[in-house]
């Protein structure tokens, strides 16, 4: 049996993070490795837990998701960060890519696209 894909959830909205965890729990290939409530905590947990994928909200306190992604990618160049946001403007997509995000899912499409997006960025 292949090893589970370990996912770190980084979102400052606790209820939304719980909803993400519930979506991920529907797929046996995925395992939630941890949760961060701000960008700085996301960096810290990524370095300590070494998840396969980080689901990163863009708008968070302390440090936003773009800054956190840059820091993660600087210290772990192969880290897979999948951006989650309420916006699907081209500017936000470009900013996410420039920060080093491997992919991008808008919050209105999460239920339909999240698991496929995770599998795509880890190459499974």
Segment roles from a protein language model:
Residues 87-88:
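Short, conserved "switch-loop" micro-motifs in signal-transduction and mechanochemical regulators
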Residues 38-41, 63-67:
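Acidic catalytic/metal-coordinating carboxylates
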Residues 49-55:
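Active-site beta3 strand of CheY-like receiver
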Residues 44, 66-77:
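Short amphipathic alpha-helix used as the core "switch/output" element in two-component signaling
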Residues 60:
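Receiver (REC) domain active-site loop signature in two-component systems and cognate sites
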Residues 91, 109-119:
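C-terminal output helix
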């Amino acid at each position: 049996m292949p090893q589970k894909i370990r996912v770190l959830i980084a979102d400052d909205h606790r209820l939304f993070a719980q909803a993400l965890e519930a979506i991920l729990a529907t797929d046996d290939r995925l395992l939630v490795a941890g949760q961060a409530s701000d960008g700085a905590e996301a960096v810290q947990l990524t370095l300590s837990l070494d998840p396969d994928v980080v689901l990163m909200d863009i708008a968070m306190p302390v440090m936003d998701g773009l800054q956190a992604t840059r820091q993660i990618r600087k210290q772990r160049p192969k880290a897979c960060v999948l951006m989650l946001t309420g916006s699907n403007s081209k500017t936000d997509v470009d900013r996410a890519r420039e920060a080093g995000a491997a992919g991008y899912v808008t919050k209105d499409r999460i239920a339909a696209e999240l698991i496929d997006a995770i599998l795509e960025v880890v190459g499974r």
